[in-house]
Amino acid sequence: MSKIGSKICKNKNLKWLRDFLAPYTKRAYIVGGCVRDAMLGKKISDFDVEIYGIDPAKFDALMAQIGACGVGKNYFVYKFKNFDLSLPRTENKTGEGHKAFEVAYADDERAASLRRDFTINAMMINIFDGSFLDFYGGERDLKRGILRHIDDEKFAEDSLRVLRAVQFSARLNFRIARDSLRLMKCLSISDLSRERINGELMKLFGAKFQEVGFLYLYKLGLLGKIFGLNLSREEAEKFAVKLKSAVKFLPKQNGKKDEREFLYLLNGYFGVRNFYDLGLPKSFEACVKEPFFSRRPSDGELLKIALDKPLKNWLGLNSPSLIKRAKNLGVYEAKFEPAIDTAEILKQGFKGAAIGAEIRRRQDLAIKERLAKPSV
């Protein structure tokens, strides 16, 4: 039993599954990202389990017995509580699009794992005896921080894997193997739907090392295809430095960084002309309207932004110096709310657009008065 296998086998979540499957097979494996994350020391709460030695009809009957929910059209994966339970399979491309695959049952561990995208996602751990299967060198690549594809032909069958490589590089801070990067440069993502592209972009936007993923988007020529941008190498490298710093220092909201920071900066520095065609969640539209400065904003400009929100909620508050200044101005946690009497403005006879203009004039005056006082 391997060390990591022993640890996984002790997981209490797996006991019921072992007891349930024991009369039928002892060849059930934790697969994919579960093994990868466990080996990276991450806590595993959801399990992908591939079950061998049971024919499809019997497997369907067993899944019906526990009330598992089947998903998929070509080949069922069953969801039950925090488990994805499936039979091993091979996949062969038969046409255009991500659904044009011929799927077949494959009761062979090596053959079934060949369909995986990267070596680090092709490792397997038996839930009964903890044995560790690694046919393609995933453990070695994991230790070296390398994303390496398994098979040229299989990898090229789904161009989404190019974007998966980008988001994995950003989440794990891994480099893409030279041969894999060369293959990816030959693959077009034009067959992908906007929905599938955005699914991977959202993972990139939430990653810790977004600058790594950004540079791979540049190297793969995807900045133009996705965002309509044509950047020089110098521009890309300088932006990556800015992005790395911004993501590091951006205050967390509800325990996590705002996933819109990537696009906020990209649009601010270069102008993403196809922004509204990207099909991203509605919440992203607000980030193009957020104040952006390519230079150091003044205290007056910070107070003006704080009229609308506490600066901890501003996407541009992404450096230690800005955070310190916001706190000194007293607008990090709270808005700047000068005492402006709207009723008095109306009483003075202001109407229509003049009302807003007068409010803004008084706000500007309040900002000047605030700046004339010592910092709090």
Residues covered by each model-derived region:
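Catalytic cores of the polymerase beta-like nucleotidyltransferase superfamily
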Residues: M1-V376
